[in-house]
Amino acid sequence: MPRLLFTVSAAALIAVFSAAASAQTPLEKSTPDPKPPVSAEPAPVTPADPFGAEVTLEPRTFIYMKGTATWETAFETIVDAFKTITDYMDKQKLTASDKPLAIYTQTDETGFQYQVGIPVAEAPKNPPKGDLAVAKSPGGKMLQFVHRGSYDAMDTTYEAITNYLDEKRLESEDMFIEEYVTDPVKMPEDKLVVNVYVPLK
């Protein structure tokens, strides 16, 4: 599937993500939530975490779901997509060959377009139908950053990425990729570890 073109720079794209994520407000609930509140503070970055490391990603075959979402429901949308893909893979007896991906193909202040997928060793013999499809994930030269903590706290990470790009005077493609090192379905949200890849021009 061809990637969508953009009319803004990647730095501006990341800035939009940051502004939108920081403007999120919790959804109202009719009953008290018995779970403790999730901290929006990012976990400390460890000295071993890459921040602006140059890497080359190889395209990977992945089963994905595309759609649109608002920032208020971003994490829930991504998790639901992973669940749908996992259910399909379980029925087809397919196993993941790499970490789950969320590819942001277009963003604005209110929401975003996405491709959420799970890499597999090879395309299934019976391709999925309906909401799911098979394609190659983006590859090429990219900068790698690491986020630790809740999804709501990722605006802090993206602000740091924007500052890094500005300081280094680097130009990047108008998209970004999140690779979930920890399972976003099973892991508590405030324990996330996410590789963020910014493709360079």
Give names to the regions the model predicted.
Residues 2-9, 14-201:
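A solvent-exposed interaction/effector surface
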